[in-house]
Amino acid sequence: MGLLLEWSIVKTLLLQLGVIAHFLVTLWLVVRVIQQQRRQSVAIAWIAVLFALPVVGIIGYMLFGEINIGHQYRKRSLMAQKLLRDFANAQQIDFNEISKNLDTEARQLSNIALLKTGLGVYDHHTLTLMTDADHIFASLLADIRAANTMILLEFYIVSPQGRVIELLEALMAATQRGVSVHLLADSVGSHAFFRSQWVKKLKDADVFVHESLPVGLFKTIVKRIDIRNHRKLAIFDNCYGYTGSFNLIDPDFFKQDAHVGKWIDVMIRVESHDTVNSVKAMALVTTTDISAETNANFSNLEKIVNRFTKSFYTQSLYIDTSKLHHRKLQHEANARGAGQNANPGVTQPPLLNILPLQSNLQAYPSVSQVSLQLIPSAPELTEHVIYETLVCAIFAAKKQVVITTPYFVPDDALLLALTTAAKRGVKVILNVPKKVDSLLVRFASQAYFEPLLSAGVQIYLFNAGLLHAKILCVDDDYCLFGTVNMDMRSFYLNMEVSMAIYNRTMTQQMLTCQHEYLRQSEPLQRDGWQQRSFGAKFLDNAIRLFSPLL
């Protein structure tokens, strides 16, 4: 009896000590939240989580509460970023001279990224908009098979299914021609790829495969594992580059069990042969990302970067070869249709549907002499740069703002920019997919629809699949295009890349693309939206409280 009494006292004492310890840890974390979190909405959300979810809230904050990419990775990344700036500065380019044809507001917008990244506006680019997977695969394959010296690929998701297999085989064939091929993929986004036989196959064929931001039990303790490399970049011979929303996936196979339809993506092919251009800036971004993942000594980091960029400083002549590229695509398409091999010695399975490719080539011809600016963003390195650029662009709008995004979870500043633009008489259109692959994001996004509709923002829900494109067009001469979603994860956590396009013709093409999406969407009516049930509204608004953490 005495032993039972003593054990009861011990249990009570342990429980009291546990409660006191939990309170002290929670209090300590609240102090850290107040000190570390610069955004008020995030701080309030985390404090609510800490008190509402005992123990779980503490574990959650320890794992995901603060931006931490790891000391060694941050050190390597900062050194790589310095090399990126040094490259831009070494060219001694007068960006004011290059951007002299831009209006004052566009020049001011470009200065935001120039200050953060060192990359300004470059001219003499030829851009080709691609809006379906057939065209994107055909163009990438053509450039892989034509590459002479270097191929750099950086993607969030690599899914070795369908037409992606043909692309991976083309990479292996390229190394046999003496081409240096590097593939950098995110550890989480490409989880299935890194556990497949394709990594060994590629490495055996002398393709360099790099895992970006690898995760593991120990890494979970020392850094945040939800900071991901969300970039999508492809560079060939320092003259041809791609970026956009497209991952290395075949939409006929990818996430078919999610019941959201096929993923709808866009990509832009950029071509330039100038000594300094945005394609070489793309190559530098991917090269620095690769070098940040290596275990080489810090003193050798510059050598690693220079190994990829040694040809950046050679003089070259600007030649617009976009028409030759299109003729090459058409020639290969016709050869496949005739059962011929357009490139002897390379196996080309007849996987492409030619008709959509030809119609898209006619719909979106290449646009030459385009001025554009590459804007890479990453936590603790160039954080907030794309967010600041985007919000300022919306505030500067005079006629229209058209947004296409798969995920829309704004903060107060972005919401204010959109609602005040609509109240100023600017036509503001937001197009999001009706179905997304994240229920939490869907509910959080819906919570913002009512204030947007009340302000006069037009909202459309895309019906023909998961609209994954990320496009912002302002008026008729400025466009932001790339990998950035309209949510805080893209703005503050992920490694992203965007292009600011300063060209009326190219912006008109982007607007045409966006209006094609709108034709496949249903408008959201304010009256009908307000008549939803109390339960539906409550659920959206409850999830909205945690939107700063999504």
What are these regions (language model features)?
Residues 1-388, 392, 396, 436, ...:
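N-terminal localization/anchoring segments of enzymes in phospholipid and broader phosphate metabolism
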Residues 177-179, 424-427:
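A short helix->loop->beta-strand "cap" motif at the edges of active sites that frequently abuts
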Residues 185, 405, 432:
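Short beta-strand/turn micro-motifs composed of small residues
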Residues 407-426, 433, 438:
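Helical hairpin unit composed of two closely spaced alpha helices linked by a short loop
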Residues 417-421, 447, 515-516:
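Short, solvent-exposed amphipathic alpha-helical segments in soluble enzyme
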Residues 472-474:
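Conserved, well-ordered active-site substructure
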